[in-house]
């Protein structure tokens, strides 16, 4: 049986009694302020090296297909399962931005100054380039011809659009059938990336 994150046991150390509680995974811990304060159902997307999408309101058991697509249950602070999916977002971003920066001869951090352009974004949405067949082994599709773009900014826009599209597939895995979340909370480094958001 799962133990609530609010359960404590008294133990004695060096003649003193202290209360010791259970630990929870950092992803589960990130849910706590929202579980305590949000009034309506939500889906939490915690971004960093991994993108962890967590739906504490989806109580459906994991299917074989979801397990194959890297879904799992975390436990919330109350010991209840939280349907979650994982996507290697930050790592994919780092690998591809490094490749783009090297090809175009710019600093790795150049992606931070690429501004959002609605027209460029619409063109990027109309095509899939970097992940035509999903995420390739080794994370990079070497058949993508980077010389198709006239600079780092448009290439990055296409990449981040394609990456976001792949990430949304991971988010979709934890939505309830016919019961989409009205509130999506994005935390972590990618919450500051305007092109991702």
Placement of each model-derived feature along the sequence:
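Active-site core segments that coordinate phosphate-bearing ligands/cofactors
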Residues: 13-184, 192-197
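Gly/charged, well-structured mid-domain segments that form the phosphate/adenylate-handling core
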Residues: 3-5
């Amino acid at each position: 049986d799962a133990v609530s994150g609010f359960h404590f046991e008294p133990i004695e150390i060096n003649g003193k009694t202290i209360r010791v509680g259970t630990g929870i995974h950092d992803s589960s811990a990130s849910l706590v302020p929202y579980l305590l304060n949000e009034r309506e159902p939500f889906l939490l997307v915690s971004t960093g090296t991994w993108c962890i999408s967590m739906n504490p309101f989806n109580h459906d058991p994991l299917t074989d297909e979801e397990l194959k697509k890297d879904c799992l249950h975390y436990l919330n602070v109350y010991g209840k399962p939280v349907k979650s999916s994982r996507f290697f977002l930050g790592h994919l971003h780092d690998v591809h931005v490094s490749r783009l920066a090297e090809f175009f001869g710019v600093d790795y951090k150049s992606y931070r100054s690429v501004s959002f352009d609605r027209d460029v974004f619409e063109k990027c949405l109309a095509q899939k380039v970097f992940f035509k067949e999903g995420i390739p082994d080794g994370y990079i599709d070497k058949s993508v011809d980077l010389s198709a773009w006239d600079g780092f900014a448009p290439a990055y826009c296409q990449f981040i659009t394609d990456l976001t599209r792949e990430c949304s597939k991971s988010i979709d895995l934890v939505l309830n059938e016919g019961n989409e979340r009205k509130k999506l909370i994005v935390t972590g480094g990618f919450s500051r990336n305007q092109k991702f958001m």
